[in-house]
Amino acid sequence: MEGRSAAAETFVWVNNASAHSQSVAKAKYEFLFGRSEGKAPDTSDHGGSTLLPPNVTNEFPEYGTMEEGGEGLRASLEFDGEALPCHPQEQQGVQPLTGCHSGLDSVTEGPKDVREAPSQSHLKEQSLQPIDSLISALKATEARIISGTLQATKVLDQDAVSSFSVQQVEKELDTASRKTQRVNKTLPAGQKNLPEIPLSAEVTTEESFYLSIQKDLTALLTGDTQAEISQIMNNGRKGAVCVQEPSCPLASLGSSAVTCHSAGSVGFLKEQRSALGREHPGGCDRSSSMGRPGRVKHVEFQGVEILWTGGDKRETQHPIDFETSLQRTASPDSKESSKVPRHLISSAGLCNSSSLTENVWDESWKAPSERPGTSSGTFSPVRLDESGEDEVFLQENKQHLEKTPKPERDRERISEQEEHVKGEDEDILGPGYTEDSTDVYSSQFETILDNTSLYYSAESLETLYSEPDSYFSFEMPLTPMIQQRIKEGGQFLERTSGGGHQDILSVSADGGIVMGYSSGVTNGLNDASDSIYTKGTPEIAFWGSNAGVKTTRLEAHSEMGSTEILEKETPENLSNGTSSNVEAAKRLAKRLYQLDRFKRSDVAKHLGKNNEFSKLVAEEYLKFFDFTGMTLDQSLRYFFKAFSLVGETQERERVLIHFSNRYFYCNPDTIASQDGVHCLTCAIMLLNTDLHGHVNIGKKMTCQEFIANLQGVNEGVDFSKDLLKALYNSIKNEKLEWAVDDEEKKKSPSESTEEKANGTHPKTISRIGSTTNPFLDIPHDPNAAVYKSGFLARKIHADMDGKKTPRGKRGWKTFYAVLKGTVLYLQKDEYKPEKALSEEDLKNAVSVHHALASKATDYEKKPNVFKLKTADWRVLLFQTQSPEEMQGWINKINCVAAVFSAPPFPAAIGSQKKFSRPLLPATTTKLSQEEQLKSHESKLKQITTELAEHRSYPPDKKVKAKDVDEYKLKDHYLEFEKTRYEMYVSILKEGGKELLSNDESEAAGLKKSHSSPSLNPDTSPITAKVKRNVSERKDHRPETPSIKQKVT
């Protein structure tokens, strides 16, 4: 080997293998096998080595890999990307298994032939795995051979040509009570006359062991097998090797003839790992079954397949590019035979012969068992019923082979893959490894690795703590190719339940996770009747292939990219977790109906989503409603009492569709179809908006228009006119409420009469007003105290911001006024506490916060008139019955404003010269009366100072008229603010709230006074009818008309 570096097989550490992983692996190896003098140990006690193509990336860094021949164990299971140099054509292989003598030479550690074989010179001619690694393993097992049964530790796959990387796949071995170990060397197919493998002289085994192996091989191997293998070797192409795993004896399964792949097929990698302490130490006996029937734990994650059977943890890895590289080594002769989906060969490789008979070797020998392969068939995994060990075998289903042809698309795809890199070969080492015992060190080591991988796996953290021994997963780096496969297809995890059923966890492409049950899934594959990804003819999906290459065939009714994992043909098994979804939908629907930790506004959110689960929830929710014998409008009112219909238009329509379906189910004879019910339901909703909406453009819809709009929409015919008239009158007389939540009902100003009569007024404060500015809306507190009431005649003198009111809106109107809280309500009828306020009454309401009431000295057309200037600078004139009543209203309004007006924020600062009046808060103050007085006093002092400063800088006479108007407007504002705060301070000093509680007798007397809203015209002064001259009229006009028109 030293002389031919180009042909030597190189084992190196993976670049991303951490130093800690390397040290742990070395320490473990030394613990299991002891230190080897002169060189580091080559073999792994639990995995062997693997030759994999360079484009394969290891996705499991926590398990280590084997290093270069003679350098020891590697701590990472990453597949190395370094390529091996090709070996010359004259390279020699290993003689195939032919009988007791030749079989021992080529497969076992036969001491006689090993000693007789040539040594290092022959090794230089053959590119073989380092024999030193085999020697180290034999030394470690020599003392344990007497125990009776052997265990597979390593299968060396020697191929004639190697163009890809050499990698070692490490498996953990529990050796505290380990009794046996078996070393199997696979057979390279490349020459007819192959010399025996020379082993070092250090290899020594006991004669009894050699004879035992000879006997078993003589009994199990036939001449036909050798002849067929030799025939395959004559193909002139260095075919790939079949890597086999240990199987149970022939008695447990029976002798079944199988057809294997022809030369050129490449074996797969099967890794086995013993469950901690659960594997029966005795192995599998030929005359009796052993172990207990265990549960099958199967995890598939696109590129990786992991199987735990019983006490064994059997892991089958299919890297993404693994099978593609296998295809590239196939010869043209094997194109037909290599078209079987690669995932069918879960643990054993494809055979080197075109028709090998499956031989189940004796368990004491534990030789690799041939796995069947076929060129056109589908395999079904068979569970061992007689044997307690949960070995899983692939058995040819001949009946299904005759029925199911191989699709042409698969032939074309695989042919393209074979022709892509024609002439290339691979070296693949497939370990078939089983352990019968555990030690404390290995148990702890496995537990640490399992928990670490579980923590980063797709399972939730609950899995790590609830069932740490029931799940296993690898930490998988999401490379772009893996991410693409995750997007294109789903992944599933299988767990074997107690009754033989397996829980299928489906992770769909959109992130949804559902749990189902399956009873016919074993090793990730279904039998002939049930198959994974069944689309049309049962065909198993092409696991581990390139992301762009798929063999899945879809049925006509299936959508491309479907994320359904299982389509069970048996009716009793629900696919994709439908049963669990229905149960969850029922539970959620019940909680929504009972409003269990849900608000009324939350219900529509769960019913109106556009997915299958939301539809299930809506269907279950509607089952709580019985609309039998009810009219459509009654059903709608009953339906909307349970929840609030809110959300987007399409979401609300989905809810109405579910309602229509339920109504038609309860009343199939009322309306012709479900579409007719839905159409009429939407028409009722639109009619309600038209008749009772806040914004009405044009006139409201009439009954005749409603009928005309629905002509011909009931399956081509008209609805009954009597039905439409009844619905129209019902909606017109009573508004249909569908978007009112519990809190909104409490805030609504139009409380029901029953609640008012019972005195159950809500304590929340809503806002009234139709302005677009929310700061100018009026706070409405139904529980506020009533300070004064009586008839008042009102005239609007100026609108908001002092703008002159149009002439048509300036007339006098009489109202029954009620000063309740900080709002002056103006009602058309006399005030009744139990009567609800109408919307018109609320529109006429006036807020008195930061307002000032004063006698209208500049208005003499009518007596007893006072002026009310609000915070938004509206000016209202009110006429009372008498001067005393006028003064009472002035005092009450000013007192309420002084006590309850909240301190304003400072005015905004800007560079504009234009004066802007600051907004004043409409909320009620939180200050006490003393603090309120101090606030008003400080504000009065500030306004006085600002007014004096403003008047100290009058505008120049040469400035523009606009600047003069701005100056006068600000002066008028400051003057008004000064007067207002002076009034507030004086009221609070006199008592404030005490003044509000006085004069109750006067308020009571006002209620009993005039019953007619009209005032006596005889009380008007006679001078009102006397015409004045021009000079007199000028004297009564404001001194600054331009300003007065804006502010008064």
Curated annotation (Swiss-Prot):
UniProt-annotated stretches for the region Disordered: 36-57, 104-126, 310-342, 364-383, 395-434, 741-769, 999-1048
Bias (Basic and acidic residues): 36-45, 311-321, 397-423, 741-758, 1029-1039
PROSITE patterns named in the record: PH_DOMAIN, SEC7
Coiled coil: 922-952
Keywords: Cell membrane, Cell projection, Coiled coil, Guanine-nucleotide releasing factor, Membrane, Phosphoprotein, Synapse
Tissue and organ expression note: Isoform 2 is expressed in epididymis (at protein level).
Any one Gene Ontology cellular component term annotated for this protein: ruffle membrane
Subcellular location as annotated: Cell membrane; Cell projection, Ruffle membrane; Postsynaptic density
GO molecular function: guanyl-nucleotide exchange factor activity
Modified residues (Phosphoserine): 76, 770, 1009, 1011-1012, 1014, 1020
Sequence intervals crossing the membrane: none
Pfam families with a match to the protein in the record: PH_9, Sec7
Primary location group: membrane
Domain PH, chain residue ranges per copy: 785-898
Residue ranges of every copy of the SEC7 domain listed in the record: 534-734
CDD domains (UniProt xref): PH_EFA6 (cd13295), Sec7 (cd00171)
Reported function: Guanine nucleotide exchange factor for ARF6.
Name recorded for this polypeptide: PH and SEC7 domain-containing protein 3
Species assigned in the record: Homo sapiens
Gene encoding the protein: PSD3
